[in-house]
Amino acid sequence: MFFCFNTLTKKTLKIMTLKNVSDLFENLIDETSKKSEIKIYQEFIQIITSLENKDLSENEIKSIETELDRMKLDSNSLNRGKYYKKALNDFKNYLKETYSLTTKGYYTQLYGGLGLSFGLLFGGAILSNLERSLGLSLGLIAGLVVGSIMGRNKDAQAKISGKTL
C-alpha cells in the first residue's frame, strides 16, 4: 500500500471588496465607448460609493462583499452590457430585500407604473362614457400623476429614514 501525504495548499479567496468593485468599474468605463455600458458602470459606482459612506456594521459590509463576490463581477463575459445590467439589477434587489436600501426614485418609478395600470382601468371603466380614447387618455394621465405623487412621498420617507442610497 502506498499513501500519498501531499501538503494541502490553502486556496486564497479574493473577496470583492467595495473598493475593488469600484476600481473594476472605473477600469471598465475607461475600456468601453458604449454609452449604455458606461451608464450601468456609473450607476454601480454610485451605489458602491453610497454604501461606503453609510454607517454599516462590519458584518453588513462582509455580507455585501460576499454577495458581490458571488456575482463574479471580474469574469470576462462576451456581452458585458447585458451581464452587468443583470448583475446591477440583482444587486439592487439584494440590497432592497436584505437591508431595505433603495436607489433614488425607486418608489416614484414603481408607483408611477402602478398608477398607469390603474389609470388605464379607471379610464376604460369609468371615463368611457366621454369618448373611448379620451377616457383612456385622461385615466392614464390621472393614474400617472397620482402614482408619481405617492411614489415621491414614499421616496421622501425612505430618505428621511436613511434607506436611500
Annotate each predicted stretch with a short phrase.
Residues F2-S117, S128-L134, S148-L165:
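Helix-termini ("caps") and immediately adjacent flexible loops/tails
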